[in-house]
Amino acid sequence: MGTKLSSRSPFSLPFLTLLAGMAIAQQPAHSGVETIDHIVAVVNENVITRHELDEMLGAMLKQLQKQGVQPPPPAVLEKQLLERIILNRVQLQLANETGLTVSDAELDQTLRRIAQENKMSLQEFDRALAEDGVSFSKFRDEIRDEIILVRLKEREVSNRVSVTEGEVDHFLETQEDSPSQSDEYRIAHILIQVSEGADPLKRDAARQRAESALAKLKAGTEFAQVAAEFSDAPDAMEGGLLNWRPAAQLTKKFAEILTPMKPGEITGIIPSPNGFHILKLVERRNQDTVTTMIDQTHARHILIKISELTSEADAHRRVTELKERLDNGSKFEELAKLHSEDASAPTGGDLGWISPGDTVPEFEQAMSALKPGEISSPVQSPFGWHLIQVIERRTQDVSQERKRQSARQAIRARKAETAFQEWLQRLRDRAYVEYRLEEG
């Protein structure tokens, strides 16, 4: 059986965080004093201007003020924000070079979904953005970029991560004796990053930064403020706050340290291959295991991936041609074996029994609309273009299966995050970046 397009949703972005991030990038420049714009960084053949950086800086200061967080020194904040822009820029450049795009129809659907998440119509959402000084057209462009970044990560990293049944078995065996395996944690973290192969001097310098951060925390400085000043993690400006995570999705070391802690407590410095961590336990909750009866779908699919060699347009053309052949009587299994680029191709595209949430939203929505025997029109997801056929449906007790699925997702999440950071660092290292922040 091939992959089930896992990762519960490659576009499961936390909408409120996303909205805040978009507003940051699009706030109007400070009025009153006019400054001469100039280049603060060159990224390959692209430039980042002082105006862009100032817009993000002003909005970030506004956001930190709303959160009641004392901002780090201006020079530190500028450097962190500039690096964030650079990382986004190199990813978007790769996406553009490889033909990764988002259609207007998909973008409009996403905007409607964001508005609904905020209990607004699209028109009400437009007005709300305007009241915050955010242009809807610019917001729309930023959302397009965010979708592209998510899909790029899935294409280049996440869908290349594999998890074996042996890894799942071992994971479950090691979790059996843990009293907190059903616990979920909401934590904040500070990461002082250092590459795994860094020399001792660089690692010592990173350790000293971590000790400085810990000293500030012990002196009573708010965790969010210290995270904003010291952390190298992408969520530093959000106070290092992470969403709820099952204990199974944390590293074993983190889970062991967090188990005896009370909400509000802070760890010491935790070394890891990629740097030094400091954690704060914000909340803990318990999710008891219960019998789960759910509706499942047995389906098969054909996948044409978008890659450096196959543009989105080429992939769409190929999958459309395959759909025409199916409409003219060709057998789904035979075409899947010959043309599908998913690991399920040798079995005729058979994905086995699929539970709600196993696949990405685009795939699940199209599959749910089909009757047994029916074949979908071409469906786009972060993995590429699909044709889907529903074979049959059933209601099933999946308690044990869900346990294994949860373990599989935890392993995949750990592997994917490590792989993504390594991939992003390689992409960053290959890029030509020239800093001109001190000029002007």
UniProtKB/Swiss-Prot annotation:
EC numbers for this chain: 5.2.1.8
Superkingdom field: Bacteria
Residue intervals of the PpiC domain: 182-283, 294-392
Gene Ontology MF terms: peptide binding; peptidyl-prolyl cis-trans isomerase activity; unfolded protein binding
Top enzyme category: isomerase
Keyword check for Repeat: yes
GO CC terms: outer membrane-bounded periplasmic space
Keyword Nucleus among UniProt keywords: no
InterPro entries, per the entry: OMP_Chaperone_SurA, PPIase_dom_sf, PPIase_PpiC, PPIase_PpiC_CS, PPIase_SurA, SurA_N, Trigger_fact/SurA_dom_sf
Keywords assigned: Chaperone, Isomerase, Periplasm, Repeat, Rotamase, Signal
Locations listed in the record: Periplasm
BP GO terms, sorted: Gram-negative-bacterium-type cell outer membrane assembly; protein folding; protein stabilization
Chain's role: Chaperone involved in the correct folding and assembly of outer membrane proteins. Recognizes specific patterns of aromatic residues and the orientation of their side chains, which are found more frequently in integral outer membrane proteins. May act in both early periplasmic and late outer membrane-associated steps of protein maturation.
Domain comment as written in the entry: The PPIase activity resides only in the second parvulin domain. The N-terminal region and the C-terminal tail are necessary and sufficient for the chaperone activity of SurA. The PPIase activity is dispensable for SurA to function as a chaperone. The N-terminal region and the C-terminal tail are also required for porin recognition.
Protein name: Chaperone SurA
Source organism of this protein record: Nitrosospira multiformis (strain ATCC 25196 / NCIMB 11849 / C 71)
